Amino acid sequence: MSEKPKVYQGVRVKITVKELLQQRRAHQAASGGTRSGGSSVHLSDPVAPSSAGLYFEPEPISSTPNYLQRGEFSSCVSCEENSSCLDQIFDSYLQTEMHPEPLLNSTQSAPHHFPDSFQATPFCFNQSLIPGSPSNSSILSGSLDYSYSPVQLPSYAPENYNSPASLDTRTCGYPPEDHSYQHLSSHAQYSCFSSATTSICYCASCEAEDLDALQAAEYFYPSTDCVDFAPSAAATSDFYKRETNCDICYS
């Protein structure tokens, strides 16, 4: 007891754990209440000191857990004391098993009438699909016929429909072959005639006029119904334009 309390650097401890244990043991010895055996557990290891310096006494640990102790179930009536408890539970369990059986029998007996009413619908469905099918009840009372019978659909071709081969090619926007040869021959005649009378001009204005004349000749055909334009008038106008342009270039 003559030892001075150790003072660590930076921390001042009023009382150590060892001194707390000594004081606790001295207090227990003075009161005469030292608990024996495994009923109480004394902490021999040092416990970390708290800031308030309090010491907590551990609770005694019993060998049997609390939820298995008999004292808590003193108010309950055990099955050993009351022998009729098991009989009542067993009877109630048998009653719950016996009641669903009539329900199961009723549910099992109901589908026996269901297939008879269900078989009539496929035959009506087949009768509505197949025209002229017999309505004899003796034939329909047999087993179900699952054979596939394709329904003959009526032809939906309209009366005013014409085949693509009978279309008039002259009304289409594509040029026929005969007209292209005629235009080429006409342009060849014009070029030969102009070369015999006057020399050919290769200036930019004349070439542009020639291209315009060729494009106009490609879009206007003599046998089309959509354009009311005479090809002879177009050819003569193009011819006079080229003649005047050539004269302007050489003048």
From Swiss-Prot:
Entry function: Transcriptional coactivator that specifically associates with POU2F3. This complex drives the development of tuft cells, a rare a rare chemosensory cells that coordinate immune and neural functions within mucosal epithelial tissues.
Source species taxonomy: Eukaryota, Metazoa, Chordata, Craniata, Vertebrata
Subcellular location: Cytoplasm; Nucleus
Key words, A-Z: Activator, Cytoplasm, Nucleus, Transcription, Transcription regulation
GO molecular function: DNA binding; POU domain binding; transcription coactivator activity
Mutation effect (V11D): Abolishes interaction with POU2F3
Residue ranges, annotated region (Disordered): 24-45
InterPro entries: OCA (IPR047571), OCAT2 (IPR043265)
Bias (Low complexity): 31-40
PROSITE patterns recorded: OCA
Description of how the protein assembles with itself and partners: Interacts with POU2F3 in a DNA-dependent manner; this interaction increases POU2F3 transactivation activity.
Tissues/organs with expression: Expressed in many cell types of epithelial, mesenchymal and hematopoietic origins. Expressed in tufs cells.
Organism the protein comes from: Homo sapiens (Human)
Record's comment describing the protein's domains: In the N-terminus possesses a conserved OCA domain for bivalent binding to class II POU domain-containing transcription factors and to an octamer DNA motif (5'-ATGAAAT-3').
Domain OCA: start-end pairs: 5-27
Chief subcellular location: cytoplasm
Cellular component, GO annotation: cytoplasm; cytosol; nucleoplasm; nucleus
Assigned protein family: Belongs to the POU2AF family.
Name of the protein described by the UniProt record: POU class 2 homeobox associating factor 3
